[in-house]
Structure formats: C-alpha cells, structure tokens
Swiss-Prot record:
The keyword rRNA processing appears for this protein: no
Gene name per UniProt: SQP1,2
Binding site for FAD: V58, G59, E78, R79, R86, F91, R158, V174, D337, M350
Name the UniProt record assigns to this protein: Squalene monooxygenase 1,2
Membrane topology: Multi-pass membrane protein
Organism: Brassica napus
Length: 518
C-alpha cells in the first residue's frame, strides 16, 4: 500500500514537472516573440530598413540599387566585402547588358577593362565556324556582350549601390532568419566585430548564391550537380580574336577560352566524373596537358598552356541545376543562384538574374507597405509568371545545349552534336536566330523549340543519308527520342502554357525590352 502511494506521488510529481516545463518553455517563446516584435517595431520607428538583402554579389547589389532608387531603405549584409575571385559570371550577354541599362547600372561595366564580345568561335574535329550576335531592329541595344573579371564588376556594383544614402552595406555573416508564426521578420547575423546581432524589415531577400545556407529552409528545390568546371587564367596574352568566345567541342565535354581583360585569358574545361584528378599533387595539371590540351586547336594551344606553365591557380566549381520555385514562407523572397540555376555553358545566369530584378523592382514599386503579406504574395505570383519568357528560354537552351556538347560513342548523340555544329555553321536565319536566343535578344520559348526541332530534323537527315537502312532508321528514332527527353522535362518544369504562349513572350518584350520604359 505504501509503495502504491509512493508511486502515485511520483507520477503526480512527474506530471507537475512536465506541465511546469511545457508552460515555462511556451512562456519563454511568447516572451521571445514579443521581444522580437517589439525590437522590430522599435527599429522601424528609428528609421530601420524596408528591405534586408542577404548577399552583395551581382544580384544583391543590383537589387539594392533598384529598390533604393524607388525610395526604399535597404540593409545589405555581405559575408565578405573583399573583391571576389570567381570563375563564373565573367560574360554578360547582350540581353544582360540591356537589363543592366534598364536598371541604370550600365556604367558598372566601365573602368574594369571589360572586353567586347560579338559572338562565338566554335571548333569541332579540325573544323571551325564563327557565329555572331545578329543586328536586330527589334533589339534596342548594341548587339554585343562583355567579358570581364567578375570580382571587378561586383565591386563596381557595390560602389554604385552604397553611393545612395538609403543603402546600408555591411559586412556580416547571416546565421538564420527570424520568424514569427511562419512569417520572416528579419535576420540574425554576426557582424565584422564578431558580435551576434539582429536586423528587422518587412521584407527579406535571400540572394546569397549557389552555396546558400538559407535556401533549404525556404524552398524545396534541391541543387543537382551536373558537372565540374575547371579553370585558370593565362596572363599577359591576347587571343587572335579577343571578341569571340572560343568554344571547343572536345571530349568528354567542352573547353573554352575567352578574353576577360586586355591581358588575361580565361581557360576552362568541363569534366563529368566526381573522381577528379587532384590539383594539390599535380595530377590535374598533368591531365590537362595530356588529355585536354591536345584537343585544343594549335592556334590556341600556346595560350591554353601558358597559365599551366606559369603555375596559375586552378579553380574547380560545380555546375548545378536548380528549378525555380517560390518560397514556402511569407516575408521573404529568394533570388539569383539560390533561386534558379541552369548549366552555365551559355553564360546566361546574370542575364536571368538582372531580368528578375527588373521585373520584381517594378512590381514592388507601387506597394506602400512591404509588410502586407497578401499583396507581396500576389506580387510574387505575378513575378513568377512574368519571368518565364526569359528564364524558361534560357533554362531550356542552357541545359539542352550542354547535353548536346557532351561527346559520345553513341551514333544518335554524335549525330545531334554534329548537327548543332552544322546548324551554327550554316549562316542566315538559322545562325542568327539561334544566336539571338543564346544572347537573350529574343527570349521566346516557341522560337527555341523551332530551332531545336530543325536541328533534330537536320541531324536525322544526315543519319539517313545517302539512303535509309533499318539501322539508320533506328538511330534516327533514338535521336528523336533524345530530343524529346531534352525538351519534355522543361515543358513540365516551366509549365506548358507559359512555354508555348506567344502572348507572354510579346508582353515581356514590350514591358522589359522596349527602347523606352513602358
């Protein structure tokens, strides 16, 4: 009986302790939430920011400038304010330059020794062709791109953004987002002094690149690593045609050379395997000399090897694919490589990003209160639809072009690869049309489908000649299947209606590519 009494007492004590603990924890959470809300209100009263931007790369800096020009108070938090040393983001397509000018940032390409680009010089099996960006009366800007050192461009953008009095650019590492009832209210970050602090704003924009630590908590779009880009700089040299991106259809994938300054040439190539040769013990250098360099045309080989001979630092970067999805949470927007990525072979990431910033800044401009979650949600739905002509065209083209460039012993795949080279070599409407798509001068998914369809038919024609045999017919059917496998996933991911609507493409061109702002 005594034992039973003791057991009852122990159970009552346990229930009391658990109840008190739960009450105490909930009370602390409520107090913390109240404290955060009070801090946010106090910060707003003291002239706190309207928008917090995580990351001051190309996207964060450009967005800060655009929003600040519209009168918003912007707090930008960047992990490292030193000049970045990157291998990606070194080529701005003509369409990207147009977007940059629409944002009032075209002068950021000046004073960084940027080099003019007029097109692509393509090499395959000892043959070469040149494909130039077309002079298009419907494209209201100079039909040329720019090569440059990414870090110099980013620093110019940061300077431009911080020149506005309502932009606060701060070095710090964002640790986490501050949430209240599923709504993001601000961020917790460690400043340059090592102190952990907070910043609150009605709207937070995550724009911290492909290695974003915050993306996983906001979106379901996991990054897929498709390949590895390896590159280095050859210094004190100049290409024979510095205004061309030199693209070599090598094995297992492609190699590139382009002039990033008046004296520097970027050399890079792609590997598909995860088991990469080691850079530290010299395996990578030997691999480049023995396997990649012999495939580079003789006229380019000396420049390609110069960087290796002089011990240039070899960088390795992952090529990733991330489908675009809207954030599950309110009070926050994800942009840039944290939001959407495609294979970098057509160098279009910055172009899509600047297009996104132009669309988003115009949609947000009429909103008096960025804390109105419902209105911001409606803006984001509109943004997601309006960006499709540019983003869907570029995503599909980038990923498809990359798949075509991969070398293969499969006859159907090799026929498609040869067909692409022949198509760009043919001149006329074929070359100009495809180059307009690559350059972001004509963001129309329907036009892209047309060109991919014609490339497929031309490749099938080559496979069947001089006369069809059962084996050639079989390879032709497989080639057609390969073409569909490249396109169908993008149709599903981007939305069939959005991809096939000529009205959406026309509206995008009128609103965001017209000679005068509509």
């Amino acid at each position: 009986m005594d034992m039973a009494f003791v057991e009852v007492c122990l159970r009552m004590l346990l229930v009391f302790v658990l109840s008190w603990t739960i009450f105490h924890v909930n009370n602390r959470k409520k107090k913390k939430a109240t404290k955060l809300a009070d801090l946010a209100t106090e910060e707003r009263k003291e002239g706190g920011p309207d928008v917090i931007i995580v990351g001051a790369g190309v996207g964060g800096s450009a967005l800060a400038y655009a929003l600040a020009k519209d009168g918003r108070r912007v707090h930008v938090i960047e992990r490292d304010m030193r000049e970045p040393v990157r291998m990606m983001g070194e080529f701005m397509q003509p369409g990207g330059r147009l977007m940059l000018s629409k944002l009032g940032l075209q002068d950021c390409l000046e004073e960084i020794d940027a080099q003019k680009s007029t097109g692509i010089r393509l090499f395959k099996d000892g043959k070469e062709t040149v494909a130039c960006f077309p002079v298009d009366t419907n494209f209201p800007y100079e039909p040329s791109g720019r090569f440059f050192h990414n870090g110099r461009f980013v620093q110019r953008l940061r300077q431009k953004a911080s020149s506005l009095p309502n932009v606060r650019l701060e070095e710090g590492t964002v640790r986490s987002l501050i949430e209240e009832k599923g709504v993001v209210k601000g961020v917790t970050y460690k400043n340059s002094s090592g102190e952990e602090t907070t910043s609150f704003a009605p709207l937070t924009v995550v724009c911290d690149g492909c290695h974003s630590n915050l993306r996983r908590s906001l979106n379901d779009n996991n990054a897929e690593v498709t390949a590895y880009e390896i590159g280095y700089i050859s210094r004190n040299c100049r290409l024979e045609q510095p205004d061309k991106l030199h693209l070599i259809m090598a094995k297992p994938s492609f190699a590139m050379l382009y002039q990033v300054s008046s004296t520097d040439v970027r050399c890079n190539f792609e590997l598909l395997s995860k088991n990469l040769p080691s850079v530290s013990n010299g395996e990578m250098t030997s691999f480049v000399r023995n396997s990649i360099a012999p495939q580079v045309p003789l006229k380019l080989r000396k420049t390609f090897l110069k960087g290796l001979d002089e011990g240039s630092h070899i960088k390795i970067t992952q090529a990733k694919r991330i489908p675009a999805t809207l954030s599950r949470k309110k009070g926050v927007i994800v942009l840039g490589d944290a939001f959407n990525m495609r294979h970098p072979v057509i160098a279009s990431g910055m172009m899509v990003l600047l297009s996104d910033i132009l669309i988003l800044s115009r949609l947000l401009k009429p909103l008096g209160n960025l804390g109105d979650e419902n209105k911001v949600s409606e803006v984001m739905k509109s943004f997601y639809a309006l960006r499709k002509p540019m983003s869907a065209t570029v995503n599909t083209l980038g990923n498809s072009f990359w798949q075509v460039l991969i070398a293969s012993t499969d006859e159907a795949k090799e026929a498609m690869r040869q067909g692409c080279f022949d198509y760009l070599s043919s001149g006329g409407f074929r070359t100009s049309g495809l180059m307009a798509l690559i350059g972001g001068m004509n963001p129309r998914p329907l036009s892209l489908f047309y060109h991919l369809f014609v490339i497929s038919l031309s490749s099938i024609g080559q496979l069947l000649s001089p006369f069809p045999t059962p084996l050639r017919v079989w390879h032709s059917l497989r080639l057609l299947d390969l073409s569909l496998k490249m396109l169908v996933p993008h149709l599903k991911a981007e939305g069939i209606g959005q991809m096939l609507s000529p009205t959406n493409a026309a509206a995008y061109r009128k609103s965001y590519m017209a000679a005068t702002v509509v």
